[in-house]
A protein has these predicted regions:
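Active-site cofactor/substrate anionic-group-binding motifs, chiefly glycine-
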Residues: 73-123
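Conserved active-site-proximal phosphate/metal-binding subdomains
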Residues: 1-29, 217, 236-261, 269-343
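Short alpha-helical segments and helix-capping/turn motifs at coil-helix boundaries
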Residues: 66-71, 129, 153-159
Length: 343
């Protein structure tokens, strides 16, 4: 199966998404419910454009040899520094709630490709039990991502995965203001450092916090004991006119690099984007919307096809900037906006 075939197949069944060849936020705008951004709908595109504004520097004056895209995250080795992102409810893409099947397919495809899958806690009662079964079925390196519900609710959900093979657990704070959550009976809300410390203490697994967009927030997550942070503005879905994640990543790297694992999402669509993120200082990237397209377009095989495309692009870009291993990537391989040569 080719990625072109995946896109064509997805267009036949996916709703509220055009399965665009380039997932840059322009096609979906502020389509909510659906894959769009918070009105006026510029957030997803701003994320994408921020990565595109960064250029790669050629460097072939290095020792020749193959590239190694593998990495170690949370004590395990993976084929690629990539996480597939969580989608709590697939009703925004389908007339039926196919969230359990989606989670299962993405876990299967990710496990086959040697990468990590993150899945949402969802609104339906069967989502988390289904994910628990999928982790065991596919021996998946998977991370449940819990919305900012009352602490007692999060801890009950965390308990489901404590004795499982889940790689880590994650609490997302950037969804606290989503309108559909505010209108629900789940009582989501903001979290303090003390809240996160309480949740950190509740599990023996690596603990991640998603929704970091400032150096201050990154330092607070580290203070709370986070083993990893995900730099994210919820794909532009929570607040309009926020910076793109590529714009804030450098200051966050400067603040907490070496103190916690840094993962970044938002508008990352290609292997070249992955090179940019890791050269700035991220340890891995997370990609979300395209995995919905990949699953609708080919199930687990479509997911694996997309990951293999990313790996090929990532490897080729690494080679041309002079990196042979992931750890070789560094800021000197990048050209940032406004950094052009001046006499």
């Amino acid at each position: 199966m080719t990625y072109r075939e995946v896109l064509e197949n997805a267009k036949k069944s996916i709703l509220n998404c055009k399965a665009c060849p380039e997932c840059n936020g322009l096609g979906c705008g502020n389509t909510l419910p659906g894959p769009g951004s918070k009105a006026p709908g510029n957030g997803a595109h701003d994320n994408w454009a921020a990565w595109k504004s960064i250029r790669l520097n050629f460097d072939t004056f290095v020792e020749d040899g193959p590239t190694d895209t593998s990495c170690t995250l949370f004590g395990r080795e993976f084929s690629l520094p990539l996480l597939s992102g969580p989608i709590g409810s697939m009703t925004q893409y389908s007339k039926e709630d196919v969230t359990v099947a989606f989670n299962d397919g993405v876990m299967e495809g990710s496990a086959a490709a040697g990468t990590i899958d993150c899945f949402g806690d969802g609104l339906a009662p069967g989502v988390l039990p289904g994910a628990l079964e999928s982790i065991a079925r596919h021996h998946a390196a998977a991370i449940p991502v819990f919305n900012p519900l009352p602490n007692a609710s999060i801890m009950r959900n965390m308990d489901m995965f404590e004795d499982s093979d889940a790689l880590a657990v994650c609490v997302v704070v950037d969804s606290a203001g989503l309108s559909h959550w505010k209108q629900s009976d789940f009582k989501p809300g903001a979290k303090t450092v003390a809240d996160l410390q309480l949740l950190r203490a509740h599990t023996k697994k690596p603990f991640l916090v998603k929704g970091i967009m400032t150096a201050k927030g990154a330092r607070q997550a580290v203070e709370a004991g986070a083993d990893g942070i995900i730099v994210s503005n919820h794909g532009g879905r929570a607040l309009a006119d926020v910076p793109g994640t590529a714009e804030v990543l450098p200051e966050i790297v400067d603040a907490v690099k070496g103190k916690t694992t840094i993962i970044v999402d938002g508008g990352i669509r290609h292997g070249v984007d992955m090179v940019k993120a890791l050269a700035i200082g991220a340890d891995a990237v997370l990609i979300c919307r395209p995995f919905a397209v990949a699953w609708f377009g080919g199930g687990a095989e479509g997911v694996k096809t997309y990951i293999e495309l990313l790996k090929k692009e990532f490897s080729e870009a690494m080679y041309m900037v002079g990196a042979r291993k992931v750890r070789d990537l560094n800021p000197e391989m990048l050209r940032f906006p406004g950094s052009g040569y001046k006499r």
